[in-house]
Amino acid sequence: MNSPIQLHKKFSTTVWHVLSWILYAVGAGPTAIISMGVYVPLIVMKNAHDHGFLRTDHTIPCSLYPEEPCSLNIVGPLWIDVSSIVFAASAISTFLQMAMMVSLGVICDYGNNRRYILFSCVIIGSISGIILSWSPSSFLLGKIVFLILVDLNFIISQSCYDSFLPIFLRFYPITRGPITLESALQDETDDLDSYITNTTIDSSEEEPYLLEHSLILNESAPPADVEDEHKAKIAARLSSVGFGSFFGAAILFQIIFTPILYKTNNNPIILPITVTVCSCWWLILSTPLCTIVTLPVENHSSDAILTLLYNSVKESYHSFKHAMSISSIRLFLFSRLFINCGIQTSLSSAVIFGKARLNLSNFQLTLLGMGISSFALLGTVIIPYLTEYFQLNSLQVVMIISILLPMAPLYGLLGYIPGFENAGIRTSADVFRATLFFGFFLGGAHSYCRSVYAQLVPSGKETRFFALYALISQTGVLFSHISLTLISNYTSDLRAVYIFVIVVMTLPLSSLWIMYQHSKTPNLHRSSS
């Protein structure tokens, strides 16, 4: 087995590696934002509506009354609202994602499994999207299965994709020079000697150490040296490049296809064409990272796949117990679960209920998706500047965003209060205003949550703790989809959705406030423990 020094000599990160990583983000963006975010759900809902019956009597075909609430018979006496179909399929997909994340995270670390699994997921996801788009309307059950496959394989591939960057950073050659894409990676790379000789803190001492040294938890902590601060800024910029490439490519595709959809008067054939183009784009641009880029083989195992699966589940359980024993991580993971749940609920309901309840056209929904992407990208650029201007840390930014995000559903609920009948979300213009406001804080919520968590994770245990972070985030998504399925299936009143989102998005505030109080008076935690 190769030692770390031998691996470092044999493998060296180049600009091509990083460009391949960014290229994947350019390919995945249109699939996530346009295809999976808007067009695939619309195709499935349209097919479900064609096979459904009015919700009021379950006998009159929905095709005769396209604007009335519609239900679909699943089996026997079980009926489900058409808008709930996508939520239910997404809930099944998210549950499968959580189950697979527990095992695949460990398997990817052995041999070349990371590349193989990534490319397999991209191929299956791309082909599933194309088949879903062009299959006949009578193939409704098959479309739902392919919807689950597209969503499942995209999320799993995204998890594999995220794991490439730490490897590129660790094996980048250490040189000194001006700040470029290369030097940014070089600055983020740890010194090889410290990588080899690094020792981790005993688990019983981790929490006191975090409280004493983390600037997130203790504002009076010893300041980090200039190099560490510089490296943190460079890491944030690199993350922004990937995030910007992801949304930038989606915006470019929306600029191309939105006028086409408008010129063809919302011709439904544009939807499968767009999904096909996005799927092929994702497959083509993922090829360099999956096939050409080679990584060092750091871990070997002669164990069978089933043994690796068992060990990975066991390791994930111990990681969960370990994380829950550290109060700061426990509090933040609780906050992250509900923040992600609120975000996912708001974005999903904007598209699905915009179509089902407010009868937004495909063109309007495409514009809405473009607005979300554009404002999310705008927020990613502006929020860091505001953070530096007001000298805020990452935890304070997350708190502010968590306070502002519930304002959108609160505005929607306002229209149901006597005396405010003209307010609320009642027209397409109202949907655009509320969603764009929400979209502006979308990028900041995700990036700053990741930044806070990165400063809480014990040294030497980053991989397993970030796998837990992804698992908690997906738990929030699962909770969102199940809740929306139940709400939309039992009531057509949007007040239930608004109230649910407000409650979910205010729950994290108490945990974030406790963490903030620890940063002001770190001894408070020790005296209470």
Curated annotation (Swiss-Prot):
GO molecular function: L-amino acid efflux transmembrane transporter activity; L-amino acid transmembrane transporter activity
Cellular compartments annotated: Vacuole membrane
PANTHER family attached to this UniProt entry: AUTOPHAGY-RELATED PROTEIN 22
Pfam family, one: ATG22
TM stretches of this protein: 25-45, 72-92, 130-150, 241-261, 269-289, 365-385, 397-417, 429-449, 467-487, 496-516
Residues bearing glycans: N198, N218, N299, N359, N489
One Gene Ontology term, aspect cellular component: fungal-type vacuole membrane
Bilayer topology term: Multi-pass membrane protein
Main location: membrane
Lineage: Eukaryota, Fungi, Dikarya, Ascomycota, Taphrinomycotina
Function comment: Vacuolar effluxer which mediate the efflux of amino acids resulting from autophagic degradation. The release of autophagic amino acids allows the maintenance of protein synthesis and viability during nitrogen starvation.
Glycoprotein as UniProt keyword: yes
Keyword Transmembrane: yes
Annotated keywords: Amino-acid transport, Autophagy, Glycoprotein, Membrane, Transmembrane, Transmembrane helix, Transport, Vacuole
GO biological-process terms attached to the record: amino acid transmembrane export from vacuole; autophagy; L-alpha-amino acid transmembrane transport
Similarity annotation: Belongs to the ATG22 family.
Protein name (record): Autophagy-related protein 22
InterPro entries, sorted: Atg22, Atg22-like, ATG22/LtaA_families, MFS_trans_sf
Domain of life: Eukaryota
